Regions:
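Alpha-helical substrate-recognition element adjacent to the catalytic core
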Residues: 30-60, 90
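Metal-dependent phosphoesterase signature
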Residues: 55-94, 104
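An amphipathic alpha-helix signature
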Residues: 21, 25, 42, 46-54, ...
Length: 141
């Protein structure tokens, strides 16, 4: 019998809300909009970058072109700062080590873009033999 546990990344393995909020606030600032306190971000996240950016914008300012421009600012900032405040939830590194030591494969499936998923997994869980690390890829639904 094969054994595998698949984890989401943000909000499951990693508490990344402060870095996501900082990147979204950077994008808002670059586009001339007011920012939000980090404490507001849990209600904005959960469905990928595009939805996050849509949710942080004032309703009257939401349009595909603006969201795409903000997405570029978000990725620029987040690419350099994705691990400034992010950290594993308590007990997660030990849990992953226990699972793999018992022969249970572990994987990550995230709606975060692929490069960021790989970076964060390798940065925070360097000794874990991941069966798969999958994030959002251009052209793949």
């Amino acid at each position: 019998m094969k054994k595998l546990v698949i984890f989401d990344l943000d909000g499951t393995l990693l508490n990344s809300i402060a870095d996501l909020g900082a990147a979204a606030n950077y994008a808002l600032t670059q586009c001339g909009f007011p920012t939000h306190p980090v404490s507001a971000y849990p209600k904005f996240v959960g469905s990928g970058i595009t939805k996050l950016l849509e949710r942080v914008l004032p309703e009257s300012a939401r349009n595909p072109e603006r969201i795409e421009m903000m997405r570029e600012y978000f990725k620029e900032y987040y690419g350099k700062h994705m691990s400034d405040y992010t950290e594993p939830y308590p007990g997660i590194p030990e849990l992953l080590e226990q699972l793999t030591s018992r022969g249970i494969a572990v994987a990550v499936a995230s709606n975060k873009y692929q490069d960021a998923v790989e970076h964060l997994v390798n940065h925070f869980f360097p000794g874990i033999p991941w069966a798969a690390v999958e994030g959002q890829k251009e052209g793949v639904p």
